[in-house]
């Protein structure tokens, strides 16, 4: 299976780091769950959310420094049949990997893959030769508090791509 990533979100470190990120799972420090996000680069950080979905991140910083990009959306370019078998409720090919949980499900990524090297089998990352495309930036999807504001325009997507997920602001929580 091959996927062209069309949307990501960046997440950085704990409150006491040089780059504190209130929207990050690492903001309150290292835990057993978020340990893979502290490196090394090129490894997966996978978490289970809402008791339903897996979401996959690729760690970006050196060992000991929390940073990762959440893989938010992609286009299945090879292996559509396998993706459909994993996501039979998909309404169209562009829907197969539009959103972080759909993308992880299409790829068959689970928390069992957290900490694995994304550059080694069965995974693989490559930067194919292609023309430059327009990239848009804005606030992250569904992140509450300061980390979900325009002060953190760390969501990046290929402008106009039909597989990019819809923007949804976080719901305001009342105490």
Feature roles, as predicted:
Residues 1-175:
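Conserved, well-structured core segments that form or line functional sites
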């Amino acid at each position: 299976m091959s996927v062209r990533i069309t949307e990501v979100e960046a997440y950085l470190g704990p409150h006491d780091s040089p780059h504190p990120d209130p929207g990050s799972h690492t903001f309150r420090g290292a835990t057993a769950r978020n340990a893979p996000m502290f490196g090394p680069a090129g490894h997966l950080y996978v978490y289970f959310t809402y008791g339903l979905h897996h979401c996959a991140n690729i760690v970006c910083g050196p060992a000991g420094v929390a940073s990762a990009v959440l893989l938010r959306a992609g286009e299945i370019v090879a292996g559509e049949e396998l993706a459909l078998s994993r996501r039979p409720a998909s309404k169209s090919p562009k829907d197969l990997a539009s959103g972080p949980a759909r993308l992880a499900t299409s790829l068959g990524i689970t928390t069992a893959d957290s900490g694995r090297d994304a550059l080694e089998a069965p995974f693989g990352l490559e930067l194919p030769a292609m023309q430059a495309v327009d990239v848009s930036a804005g606030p992250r999807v569904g992140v509450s508090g300061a980390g979900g504001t325009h002060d953190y325009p760390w969501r990046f997507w290929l402008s106009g791509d039909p597989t990019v997920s819809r923007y949804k602001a976080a719901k305001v929580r009342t105490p």
